[in-house]
């Protein structure tokens, strides 16, 4: 049961993040409400607040996911390397972007 709940939480957070990125393509951040996000994500407000305190928390989560992907790519470099091999980092970033191109395309286009 706990594993299913964990998957459900991941799914809910992903839906919230995607909804926010989509909405940012339509209107300014300060015009987006939690109601807009939950309507777009097709979840209830309780689900939103179970995962995030506010909209800025969703933005922080999106950025943390991107930063974590970059950190993981850098950590794969040998400790003795003076500088990370840019090719490996770029390949990892490419895989990340290809995993969900629409999401990252919208996130990159967004001026937040």
Where are these regions (language model features)?
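Short secondary-structure transition hinges
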Residues: 72, 76-77, 101-112
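Alpha-helical structural segments
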Residues: 11-22, 26, 40, 57-77, ...
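Primarily secretory-pathway and cell-envelope proteins
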Residues: 1-2, 78-98, 102
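N-terminal intrinsically disordered/low-complexity leader segments
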Residues: 1-9
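Residues that scaffold the ATP/ADP-binding catalytic core of kinase and kinase-like folds
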Residues: 51, 58-61, 106-107
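Helix-turn-helix
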Residues: 23-57
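Residues in the helix-turn-helix
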Residues: 15, 47-49, 103
């Amino acid at each position: 049961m706990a594993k299913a709940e964990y998957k459900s939480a991941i799914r809910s957070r992903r839906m919230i993040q995607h909804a926010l990125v989509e909405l940012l393509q339509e209107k300014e951040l300060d015009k987006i409400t939690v109601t807009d996000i939950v309507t777009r994500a097709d979840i209830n407000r309780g689900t939103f607040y179970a995962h995030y305190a506010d909209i800025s928390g969703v933005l922080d989560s999106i950025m943390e996911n991107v930063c974590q992907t970059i950190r993981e790519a850098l950590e794969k470099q040998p400790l003795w390397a003076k500088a990370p091999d840019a090719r490996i980092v770029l390949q990892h970033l490419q895989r990340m972007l290809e995993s969900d191109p629409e999401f990252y395309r919208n996130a990159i286009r967004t001026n937040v």
